[in-house]
Amino acid sequence: EELIRHIKRLRSEKNAVILAHNYQISPVQDIADFTGDSLGLSLEASRTDADMIVFCGVHFMAESAKVLSPNKQVFLPHLGAGCALADAITVESLEEWRERYPDHTVVTYVNSTAEVKAESDICCTSANAVSVVRSLDTDKVLFTPDKNLARWVAKQVPEKEIVAYDAVCPTHDVLRNASVDRTRRDYPEAIIIAHPECREDVVDAAHEVCSTTGMLDAVGRYPDARTFIIATEEGMIHQLKLRYPDKEFVSADGDRKSTRLNSSHSSI
C-alpha cells in the first residue's frame, strides 16, 4: 500500500500517465490510468496532457506510444520486457522476404518494431487485420510477423493470396487444443474465447476468436453463459472479471509478465 501511494504521488508530481496492457498482472493494471491493448493505450495517452508516459508492457508498445506522442517522455518500467514475436523479424529479413515476393503488399502486425513498421506498406492490429487485408486493392499479401494470425486472416479472406512470415507468439503458440479440451471437460458448458495468435486447432475449437479488447465485448454476447475459457495471457482475465463480476473465467495457460509494481515505481 505504501508503494502504491508513492506511485500515485509521483504520478501527480511529474504529470505522468500510467498505461497497463491487458496482459499485465492485476496489481499493475489496478494502478494504471488506462488499461487495454497496445494501440488503444497509445492513442489514449496521445489524447492526454501528460508530460510523461509510463507504459507497463513490452518494448514495441512503448515505441508505438512514442510515435503517437513524440513530444512526451516515454518510459518502459522493465527494459528487459521484450516480445519474441516482434524480435523475430528485422528490417533486413523483411527486405530479403520482399525480394522473393516483389508483387506482394506487406501487411505488418502491430506487434513489431518501429523499424519494421516503417518498411511495411500498411500495419494492422489483431482486431482489424481482416478488414485491413480485405481493403487492399491487391490480391497478393505478405503478412508479418505472426503466421497464426495470418492463417486466421486467410480463412476469413479466402479471395486473397496470403504468404505468412514464419514467426509466432510463444505465449499463444504453446497452447494446444488438448489442454483446452482438458479444461473443457471440467467446464463442459463453458464458452471458449481465443486470441487469433493461437494455433489453428485452438482457434477452430473456439466459439469466439478476437483481440483482447474484443474479448470484453464477446462475453457480452453470451448473457446466459456462466463460464468462459480464455485462450490468451492470464492477465486478461483480470479485466474480464472487472467487467463481468458475475461470470467465471478460466485461463487456458500461464503467466509471462515481467513488469511489477517496483519497476513501475522506478520508472516514475
Where do the language-model regions lie?
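Active-site loop-to-helix "anion-binding N-cap" substructures in soluble metabolic enzymes
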Residues: 1-230, 236-260
